[in-house]
Amino acid sequence: MLPTILSISYEHTYAYLSKYQTAYACEGKKLTIECEPGDVINLIRANYGRFSITICNDHGNVEWSVNCMFPKSLSVLNSRCAHKQSCGVLAATSMFGDPCPGTHKYLEAHYQCISAAQTSTTTNRPSPPPWVLSNGPPIFGNGSGLIHPPGVGAGAPPPPRLPTLPGVVGISGNPGLFNVPPQHTAVTHSTPSSSTTAVGGGRLKGVPTSTTTTKHPAGRHDGLPPPPQLHHHHNHHGDDTATPTKPSSKLPAGGNATSPSNTRILTGVGGSGTDDGTLLTTKSSPNRPPGTAASGAVVPGNGSVVRTINNINLNAAGISGGDDESKLFCGPTHARNLYWNMTRVGDVNVQPCPGGAAGIAKWRCVLMKRMPDSGYDEYDDDPSSTTPAPNGGDCLHNSSSCEPPVSMAHKVNQRLRNFEPTWHPATPDLTQCRSLWLNNLEMRVNQRDSSLISIANDMSEVTSSKTLYGGDMLVTTKIIQTVSEKMLHDKETFPDQRQREAMIMELLHCVVKTGSNLLDESQLSSWLDLNPEDQMRVATSLLTGLEYNAFLLADTIIRERSVVQKVKNILLSVRVLETKTIQSSVVFPDSDQWPLSSDRIELPRAALIDNSEGGLVRIVFAAFDRLESILKPSYDHFDLKSSRSYVRNTAILSNDSDVNAGEIQQRLRILNSKVISASLGKGRHIQLSQPITLTLKHLKTENVTNPTCVFWNYIDHAWSANGCSLESTNRTHSVCSCNHLTNFAILMDVVDEHQHSLFTMFDGNMRIFIYISIGICVVFIVIALLTLKLFNGVFVKSARTSIYTSIYLCLLAIELLFLLGIEQTETSIFCGFITIFLHCAILSGTAWFCYEAFHSYSTLTSDELLLEVDQTPKVNCYYLLSYGLSLSVVAISLVIDPSTYTQNDYCVLMEANALFYATFVIPVLVFFVAAIGYTFLSWIILCRKSRTGLKTKEHTRLASVRFDIRCSFVFLLLLSAVWCSSYFYLRGAKMDDDTADVYGYCFICFNTLLGLYIFVFHCIQNEKIRREYRKYVRQHAWLPKCLRCSKTSISSGIVTGNGPTAGTLCSVSTSKKPKLPLGVSEEAHDDPQQQQHTPVPITEDAIMGASSDCELNEAQQRRTLKSGLMTGTLQAPPQTLGGHVVLERGSTLRSTGHASPTSSAGSTHLIFAHKQQQQQQQQQQGPLGEGYYHQPDYYSWKQPPTGTGGLKTPREYYNNTGASASSPQQAHEVFYWTQKPNSGQHGKKKRGAGGVPASPSGSLHSRTAAASQVLFYPSYKKTKAGQPTGYPQYAEALDPPLATGNAAAYYQQQQQLRRQQLHQQQQQQLSSDEEQVEQHAHLLHLQRRAGSQQQLPAPPPHMAQYQHEFMQRQYRNKHSNCDLGMGDAYYNQGSVGGADGGPVYEEILSNRNSDVQHYEVGDFDVDEVYNNSVGTGVFNNMRAAVAAGGSRYGGGSLSGGSVSSRSQQQQLKKQQQQQSLAQQRSARRCTADDDDDEEEEEDEEATAAEQLHDSVCDEDEEEDESDLEDDAHGLPPQSDERMRRLMAMQDEDFKRRFQRQLRKHGAPLDYGALPPGSGPQPEHNGAVFGVSGGVGEGSMRGAFRQQQALNAKSPGGRLAVNDLFGHGNSGPPLPPANQTPAQKRQQLQKLSPQSTTSSSSHTSHSNPNPHPLQLTHPHPHQHPPHHQQRHLSAMLDENNTVRCYLEPLAK
């Protein structure tokens, strides 16, 4: 029966760690070993002696030997304790003998408690690797990067000392050492045999108790650490030893009993190189006769030799010799002046030492793994090449199932292709080579009468001039110690103190010089001739020899003195100080003594005084150069960071996959500072009362990390950190603190220089893709954040907006931190910080996703479904929970183990430990599960609500919530895919997993999709955001024309034409199915035939895609049409004049909504209409200026078109009573506002503008506004078909001859008051309400950016003297920007009304976030009430004149109006004359060209125009003075005051401008008494103005303020909402946004025409410097008829906007 085969791996090693135990008993005590019932003792190894100075040493004696052992210790213990449950052995020399007299010894036993049943079934019990059973090795072992030459003591004379066990004969009779030499032996388990002998060459020839000797030098490049030493003070001669296995009591009857070899690829560092290598190991059979070789060659015998290389069974591979085996040889080479012939793998080549040196040199041939770029694939198996297996084959020892041997042979051959024979180590082993000169010095120093000074001088000369070998280093340090010992006795022979000091000082100089020679670079090859352990021993001997000689001098000096010995590589200072002179700390070295390094050591005063003797303190300092290259740290400590290298190098075949992927591996450490030494008194390990401080400079600053303060332990021959701590560190220096004295240095970890960052493992393509993916995602996240920031007026400030803003911020931080982290290395100072912040950002991001899902759930389960408003307390709670919890978790993680953020390979992952799962994985999973749970709950509620009967608005809101939930769920899944793929990719790449690339490309794809998803579903799909994008593109001239002229960038159309080319659009427009036939020629009023042409059809895309800011292919005047879906046909009437586009509509009009002047960017007046009939708009060519163009719904919705195309006079229009009978009543009305260019500014600075340039938006207040602008402001009212009620108050607004003078006089009266207040209001006021409006109002520009052949329009008559400024404004207008309309999808398209006759409601949508602002009433001017009052008197006077002389106005009467007396008309004439004179005087103050202006005023119309211009000029100068006086009358700010004021402001501004326009033209219009259902439309010019035109910005604010001042005594001073839309008779019954407030109407009703007129006349006559009229005490004289009040109901809709429903008019 074959014995049980056990493969030992690291995984099994951890199992052993839990079972193996160690017991100690000091000399004279009893060692007791006891196991649990049912278990028996299985001894592993034992020793009676001493290997450690710390065990059983209560008094700290350092003179005892630490190389003491009794070889038969294990045999004695086995006889007493083997296979027993408990036993006891007395640790005494009577039992074990006395291996080292004078040393206090102890008994040490390593054992294992095994089940008693195992002893009867197991034939072979393999022992674990000895390094697993290490008895607490020092923190850094003896080894170094330098190699231990293989074969030293193993095959070359002098023969090694092998353990002498029962049946084992030591080589050459030398008693062998039992212990395993540190880092140089590995255990090979085999079947027991009877004897072990050694053959020539040092190779072991084994039978039954076979031992395998392998070397594990330090410094492997594959990272596998050599086994740490069991003891640290033994085998100072570098002899190799073997550990025998325990013989078994039962053996199989026959057959080949083989056990696997545990030999790994051996590594070593020869010089500066690192190599992998293996030794050939043997496995013997029980029947193998003694004397057979075990070196790897097949030795004849009764048994077979199982030869393995790197655990590769060469027998199974079919490699038995011949050509296949002949390839496993190292080629010949030259090294160290010797020729090394071809050597078989596993053999040691031995030669005599070169250059006449005594001894032998050795070099071993091993099998090394090829570099990765060798082109061979380690696992490149070809399953197709199989052949039958002879004799059934064998099974690999660590395979779970047997495979055919031929297939195994193929795998072995493939495996061996990755290895090549190599000499190991890099240089031969010349430890036994000694030169003749040093041999001679060694003989002389041992002679009694030799001169120590002469020997020291000769030694310094030899070491500086002769070539030394490895053995010479050992001899030299031994001579140094011998010289110091002899000088200690010889100095007493010199009676003179000075002579003694001189002799010892000379000896010290020679010794220091010799030590410097040994450290010189020329002797580096001599150090490399030594194995690592010998290097450590030689270095320790050198340090102690120098210290002994230095203290020899210090003890000789009896007074305060300082001696400095400075040579090339050593600075030594001996200081003898008197305690009374020590005032502060002692510092070494001085700044000028040692320029090679900036290291510094500081001894505190208290520590020095405590160690004084006889009032003197003796200190020895030393600084060394190049010693750091000798005292290299060993690698007996492990970490989990580079386990992949172990897995790659250990897994030989596919069935090696059971090797744990997390196996431990070495961490490369270097000595990264010079060695500096300080010794105090006679003891080297004196505990100081106060710690010393060391400042050490780093030799290497790149790719190093984790500094550790260490000292050199003379006893352990290793670096240790006991008693030292790191105080601070930076890139170049570290500060340490130690409580004892010895040799100090800094150890640091080395980051693999070939893998500087995470990207080093990426191939070129993947690295580029990762950059692109992260860049795309970052760009889209930034766009989303800027969208939320720049277009915040579009969004409702709600919890969902805040949540998504936080999510975007977290994702942006994650992307940026990941991008930074993958470029950092472990040594970077930012590495740990990046990992910490990335941890926090991921936790915060997942928390926000959870809160977003919870918010959707709470919205559906509460009253928030119909009202999405700001929820500040809830959002603050989200902030606290997300960021607070994340920071708390990270803080706890930092407190528990800060190294978890710095111990990983890359700076984007935490160390995969329990803390990682507790603080990262579990919180993330909790948040994700909670988010998914709330999402499913929300979906269930949505399904339930969808099946119940809800209102229309609830269904709309549910649809919005349903869309949000879907997007959030997809967003969450996509983000999970991104993070999971990135995690698995990093882990896979770290372990060199083949699937890592798959995860990597998945991460690239998912991350890119994440960015696109954020942009598309969170930005593009939102109609509001799309509209704002278009607006932003339009309003910024720095953007390229291709964007601003694209068909998707604006929703306004531009149609131009001249004759047959009418309707030509921008070249960027594309043609689709024509829907909007439109076309009007500029010269239509001149050519009646041309007016009859068929309109040129234009397309929907033309309307949507044209831009007023684009260069067009024609130079004619443009016509604008607000975009909208209009069904039916649009015909151009033959009477169209000016710059307007007239549409005759049929069927239904569906408007996308046009921006109200009182609304924000997201506000509109919705249009609902059905079965609208054709309508006409008639315009009359007039001078460029203000004009009021009112669609004639207030008077007559249907103006019957004339067959001839002529225009009816205004008188005919208002006197026509039969129009309504012949044409149906149209259901709605439309208002168009016009703006006059800023012709009267003369460069004056407007209030609120400051030094800021004019707005480029081309809005109402822009200085670069167009000469003609159209503001589409639709507002519709339901009126009954037939004869609408008359509106007689319109007659008083249309009397130009009477109104012109009054207006001019009014502005003259206000001029002085405003000038007095101008200096108090400069730069102190905010933007006026009109300037607030300009940010929201929508304008479509005319006459903008014409072609090169287009002629600029001629300036109006009153602008003739300002030709230059007019041209400049036209030029600026050409380069101004486009404005934006509304998108079609944003507005509701249905009608809440019904058919004709049914109630139709108006809806006014006002974005509360923009409209609701706080303003004082003081923002409005006072002066306008007077103007309105005068206007009312003028209206009444005009009605009286019409009644008296009806023939002038075409006959008829005014219905519903009052008739004024003839005396009132006379007063108005006088008032007009005075105003004309005053206006001429004020005109001189406005311009420097007044004299020329007076000569040009030849007729009344020109005078009126000039007067209007002068008043405008004065108004611009004085508008800043209008607010200060009335600030005291302001009302407290109200939440809805902004919207109300703007509504009232629009009404006042319209009336004022309407009156001013009529005065300027001076042409009377006959309103008549006919119903407004018939008659032509009023005449007007082609220019259009908006809410606040260019004539006088802010001039309409005073009326509202005055009215508020008059009503300040009313309770609260608020405006009633219902009064906003009441129909009064103080002005035109405008749409809801233009209604006069009830409070103001009541005040105006108190002003009679007589009082108003007389007040105006009195002021004009009596006061040459007019002052404001006193309107606070009006005298009511006549009350106009009161019209119907319309009540308003308001609510907040789902978009957080105010939705007003106006009561329908009476039928």
Swiss-Prot record:
* Extent of Basic residues compositional bias: 1674-1686
Q: Which residues lie on this side of the membrane: Cytoplasmic?
A: 789-801, 850-875, 942-968, 1021-1707
Q: Where is the composition biased (Acidic residues)?
A: 1489-1503, 1513-1526
Which residue numbers delimit the SUEL-type lectin domain? 25-114
Pfam families found in the cross-reference section: 7tm_2 (PF00002), GAIN (PF16489), GPS (PF01825), SUEL_Lectin (PF02140)
User: Which of UniProt's keywords are assigned here?
Assistant: Cell membrane, Disulfide bond, G-protein coupled receptor, Glycoprotein, Lectin, Membrane, Phosphoprotein, Receptor, Transducer, Transmembrane, Transmembrane helix
Which GO terms fall under biological process for this protein?
A: adult locomotory behavior; cell surface receptor signaling pathway; proprioception
Residues annotated with Phosphoserine modification: S1156, S1255, S1262, S1327, S1328
Regarding how it is modified after translation, the entry says:
Proteolytically cleaved into 2 subunits, an extracellular subunit and a seven-transmembrane subunit.
Q: Is the keyword Mitochondrion assigned to this protein?
A: no
Biased composition annotated in UniProt, kind: Low complexity: 275-285, 1172-1181, 1316-1326, 1456-1481, 1651-1673
Superkingdom of origin organism: Eukaryota
Disulphide connectivity of cysteines = C709-C736, C724-C738
The record places the following residue ranges in the Extracellular compartment, namely 1-767, 823-828, 897-920, 990-999
What subcellular locations does the record give? Answer: Cell membrane
Region called Disordered, residue ranges: 176-301, 376-400, 1169-1188, 1236-1260, 1316-1335, 1450-1538, 1563-1582, 1612-1687
CDD domains for this protein:
7tmB2_CELSR_Adhesion_IV (cd15441), Gal_Rha_Lectin_dCirl (cd22830)
Q: Where are the transmembrane segments?
A: 768-788, 802-822, 829-849, 876-896, 921-941, 969-989, 1000-1020
- Main location per UniProt? membrane
The membrane topology of this protein is:
Multi-pass membrane protein
Instruction: Keyword check for Plastid, yes or no.
Output: no
Q: Please list the residue ranges annotated as the GAIN-B domain.
A: 561-754
Q: Note the subunit structure.
A: Forms a heterodimer, consisting of a large extracellular region non-covalently linked to a seven-transmembrane moiety.
- Output this protein's name: Latrophilin Cirl
* Species of origin: Drosophila yakuba
